[in-house]
Every structure is written in C-alpha cells, then in structure tokens.
UniProtKB/Swiss-Prot annotation:
PANTHER family: 60S RIBOSOMAL PROTEIN L11-RELATED. GO terms for biological process: translation. This is Large ribosomal subunit protein uL5. GO terms for cellular component: ribonucleoprotein complex; ribosome. Part of the 50S ribosomal subunit; part of the 5S rRNA/L5/L18/L25 subcomplex. Contacts the 5S rRNA and the P site tRNA. Forms a bridge to the 30S subunit in the 70S ribosome. It comes from the Bacteria. Gene3D superfamilies: 3.30.1440.10. It comes from Thiobacillus denitrificans (strain ATCC 25259 / T1). Belongs to the universal ribosomal protein uL5 family. The lineage of its organism: Bacteria, Pseudomonadati, Pseudomonadota, Betaproteobacteria, Nitrosomonadales. GO terms for molecular function: rRNA binding; structural constituent of ribosome; tRNA binding. PROSITE patterns: RIBOSOMAL_L5. Keywords: Ribonucleoprotein, Ribosomal protein, RNA-binding, rRNA-binding, tRNA-binding. Pfam families: Ribosomal_L5, Ribosomal_L5_C.
Amino acid sequence: MARFQEFYRETVVPKLIEQFGYKSVMEVPRIQKITLNMGVGEAVADKKVMDHAVADMQKIAGQKPVVTKSKKSIAGFKIRENYPVGCMVTLRRGQMYEFLDRLVTVALPRVRDFRGVSGKSFDGRGNYNMGIKEQIIFPEIEYDKIDALRGMNITITTTAKTDDEARALLAAFSFPFKN
C-alpha cells in the first residue's frame, strides 16, 4: 500500500470527520483520480517531439500515456483532424497516491521561486487544477536528456461536494497552499 494511501486512512479520515462532522467514513471526501495532460502543439511540425513528450510523461506517471488527437481541422494552427496534439494519463488507486506523494514532497519544492500553489484553482465542485511550467522538477526526468521544457496540467478529481472540503482534504495531504 502506498505511503499516502495509508496516511489517508489513518490520519486524514479522522481529521476530516472531526472537522466537518461526517456521520460515516464513506462520507469523507477522497481523491478519485489524478489526470496529467500535456499539450504538444509543436508536434504538428515534427513527429519526434510527440515521442519525446510521451516518453517524459511515461517516466513521470509510471504509466503509458494516451496520445490525444485534434477533433477538427484548424487552418490557423496548421492542424488537420486526427493530428496528434498532446498526451494524457489518468492515475487511480496506488499509482495515484504514489504520484501525489512525489508531487508534494519532491517535485513542488524543486520549482524555482516556489511560494506555494494557488488556493483559488478549485472548480466549484471540489476538483483542483494546477499547471506546471517545466517537467524537469520531477526527479525521473534527467536534465541532460530532455529536448525541450514542456509544461503540463494536473487535475485532481475528488469526491468532495464543495471547494472547502476539497481544500481541507488536500491541505491534510500537506499540499502547499499560498493563501
């Protein structure tokens, strides 16, 4: 069992029950999935860029990403329908907790001039979105072997009904919020 999964069961659940007064353990919000999405617009000109992005994402997530394709042709962006434009990974259960552990304890502290993540990036339904500007903050990526700095979106989907519940859940996992 992942370290954060055990931590959730033994520490976070009792803390949230006390804070919000839930009657059942099943009412306590939990993290359903973490989705990593990397848009690779440069892949239109050079197909190797997509291969590098997929390889980086696979190292970070520990799981093979799905290549996302364009839904329709857009002449201004020089893309046609079904062109590869990005890649994404959905993490659940053990791998999700392992990734969250690495994100909070290793990756985020390695961000340059890091002062915490925004507490305003909740969507109103208890889900949290954040962006990362460069993939080199993850220890799995070797700085010498990357071809370009690429960012990614990280979406944390929870069962929380409100943003306050989701914020309390992520704060219990020692998520570094600014405000």
